[in-house]
Design a protein with these regions (language model features):
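Anion-binding and metal-coordination hotspots
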Residues: 1-301
């Protein structure tokens, strides 16, 4: 039906070895002789500016393979590190059918970015736009959730949230968001505002972009009986709000529904397809090198 889709990625070992690699302080792509380089190295140079490979992150890998430099050195399996590519699946959960496949570097930024690529490609080729997208926490960043909500796709995805506190004091979740007045309301009923004045120049006011800071009045917090539960070490309480916080709240609200429980079960169908790929088809290690070789093998499998 194409209404409920799920996405995930799995590591596939590349045809590369640590013995034939260079540490990051000895690797320089600018020194590679393109004329004498093999196909896999030329493809690496061609994809340095692509979001799925070279441009996914400015951080250089710890090691780079001479034979397949586009592969990613990773220890994501909690064991010995190895060179790999990520096989990204977009599936229709109602029928367990793979709708699209994309090969990327084995880092979260590239895997999450492939989601946008595959959803746009499926829309262009098959005119499919899912009602919901199911994924794990790796895909729960603010920009990703905002991208989905803007396209009217319900994010059935756990939110990456580091606002929780372990010392027993109130976290951001304990404060109520008042969208109409652009402020937070604390459990004691006091307002935390971003600005407490009207600017004659609109360019100095709130922009709605980046991280916004909301703060209570100092004398209000000092006289509050709940200050030990709120901000025991600060003069007043401050809360930050991300640019895509509205989309994150949409995802949090979805997580409380019964439909989310159904989606959590449907997500397992992606893992079943990866198990079939590795155990039945035996694709635990790639035979071809380079981004194109990895993509071709993933498509054929």
């Amino acid at each position: 039906s194409g209404q409920r889709m799920a996405i995930d990625a799995s590591l596939i070992e590349a045809d590369a070895n640590k013995q034939y690699s260079a540490p990051k302080d000895e690797w320089d792509a600018a020194r590679v002789d393109r004329g004498a380089a093999p196909r896999a190295v030329k493809e690496y140079l061609d994809t340095l500016d692509e979001a799925a490979f070279g441009a996914a992150t400015p951080v250089q890998p710890k090691f780079t393979s001479f034979s397949d430099p586009a592969s990613q050195w990773t220890a994501a399996r909690k064991g010995p590190a190895f060179f790999s590519y990520s096989d990204n699946y977009l599936i229709d959960t109602d029928h367990g059918v793979i709708v699209d496949v994309e090969a990327t570097r084995s880092i979260r930024q590239a895997e999450v970015g492939s989601t946008k690529t595959m959803l746009d490609r499926v829309k262009a080729k098959f005119d499919l736009r899912p009602e919901r997208l199911i994924a794990d926490t790796a895909y729960g960043s603010g920009p990703m959730l905002g991208w989905l909500v803007d396209r009217k796709i319900a994010p059935h995805i756990p939110v990456i949230d580091k606002a929780g506190r372990s010392d027993g004091t109130w976290s951001r979740a304990d404060f109520e968001w008042d969208a109409k007045n652009n402020q937070y309301i604390c459990p004691e009923g006091e307002a935390l505002k971003q600005f407490r004045r009207n600017y004659s120049d609109p360019n100095r006011g709130p922009t709605g972009k980046g991280v916004a800071k909301y703060q209570a009045l100092k004398h209000t917090c000092q006289a509050c009986p709940s200050k030990p539960k709120c901000c025991p070490k600060a003069d007043c309480r401050k809360i930050t709000r991300e640019e895509h916080e509205d989309a994150r709240e949409v995802a949090r609200a979805i997580r409380k529904t019964d439909q989310y429980k159904v989606s959590a079960k449907l997500r397992k169908k992606v893992e079943m397809l990866f198990a079939h790929l590795k155990r039945i088809l035996g694709l635990g290690r790639l035979r071809l090198r380079g981004p194109c070789g990895a993509n071709d093998e993933f498509l054929l499998a």
